[in-house]
Amino acid sequence: MLLCAKGKILLKNDKTDFTQGRILPKLAFFMLPILGALVLQAAYGAVDLLVVGRFGSTSGLSAVSTGSQVLNLVTFVVTQLAMGVTVLIARYLGEKRPQYIGQVIGGAAVVFTLLAAALFVVLVFFARLISSLMQAPAEALDLTASYVRICGSGIFFIVAYNMLSALFRGLGDSRSPLIFVLVACIVNVIGDLVLVAGFHLDAAGAAIATVAAQAVSVICAIAMLLKKELPFKIHRSDFKPNPQCKKFLGIGLPLALQEFLTQLSFLALCAFVNRLGLEASSGYGVACKIVNFAMLIPSSLMQSMASFVSQNVGAGNKKRAEQSMFTGIGIGLVFGCAVFALVWCKGDVLSGLFTADAAVIANSYAYLMGFAPETIATAILFSMVGYFNGNDKTLWVMVQGLVQTLLVRLPMAYIMSIQPNASLTMIGLSAPTSTAVGILLNICFFLWLKRYENQTCA
């Protein structure tokens, strides 16, 4: 329920109080560590591909490319589900009701543990089936299944990391998750070099390094949480299903479902590309790693926007929440245009960082040419989505995401993939096309919501 309160509720720590002060520096200060964490996460995934591309086989490169798509689906869905925890914690801080946060965390621990157990069974025991459904090239099928199975065995660490990061971001602390990812990235680089370059374990070595890195980062996160001075208390009795579970799931489930179908569309896209051959598959995998870097600023804006907006909505300051969205769009457009120019003009050079295979580089660059406008379009879309997430309009976020995925991106990518002499450029163009539709939908909903709230508060 939206309140039309005029007063501001202040938090004890000015750095984590988003309800007062200039928006741009506050948002930038909170966003930068999130951006840093995302940069390291992208580097984390890129290192696997880079090391396997240099010291492994082309089949191993395809296996990591396809297998990482599966793991990305799981990770992104868990992240969106955890967004419910972030938003609810930030809301309680804004409303000055921290006594409920312990129940949120305890309930979340139970829910995410059950989720991790289910994912473990699926990824470990059905790895080969999943790889087959992804239409992994025959020569890379065994390596892909091995990669998925090994990473699936460490899914508890991946889920735990995302839940703990959501907790810290909800408290307005975006620096601690940055430290966790930095530790994981260092461990992963060392592991890749030892297992892939040293012991020549190919895709399996990259998977083992990934699991080890996640385990170390979770240990660091728990240690930091125990030492941190928290504005609330956690009791043993909080670790059970409780009324707060329904609340954060009500926020997070629509986002998780939307993200699941979005990532499923990218898995389908990966399958479409895999049918075009090993070189196209490997080229698409390289392009996806570059895309991950290109999307960093819009993604960090979306994550930071949710906490920023949620605090202000909780404090009854809707105008400031709207202003933060427009500030985020401005930041995103500045960087989005620069990234577009880099990807469009130097996509082949960027692709060459991951492999020396000329055919793979050419396929990667072809996809990037179609995808490039997405770097500008998402600057607008992701800031709006972050605003709606923080404003507890996650059901709408799910609806607009499904329209983009099911009615635009997936049909267009499929149609382009079955054309004679199918072009990776046209397949890549399905992403910015669907985002443009999403922007139009969100603008219409924003205008409608603003009119509705004004009438309600009149």
Annotate each language-model stretch with its function.
Residues 61-121, 158-177, 283-347, 378-400:
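Small-residue-rich hydrophobic transmembrane alpha-helices
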Residues 18-50, 54-55, 69-84, 88, ...:
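N-terminal transmembrane alpha-helices
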Residues 82, 151-169, 177-185, 206-219, ...:
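Short runs within selected transmembrane alpha-helices of multi-pass transporters and secretion channels
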Residues 29-48, 150, 184, 213-217, ...:
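Transmembrane helical elements of multi-pass membrane transporters/channels
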Residues 39, 43-62, 131-138, 194-201, ...:
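Helix-terminus/linker motif at the lipid-water interface of multi-pass membrane proteins
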Residues 73-76, 188-192, 217-222, 293-296, ...:
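Hydrophobic transmembrane alpha-helices of multi-pass small-molecule transporters
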Residues 34, 38, 50, 87, ...:
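Transmembrane alpha-helix boundary and packing residues in multipass membrane permease domains
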Residues 1-31, 89-156, 198-253, 309-374, ...:
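Short alpha-helical transmembrane segments in multi-pass integral membrane proteins
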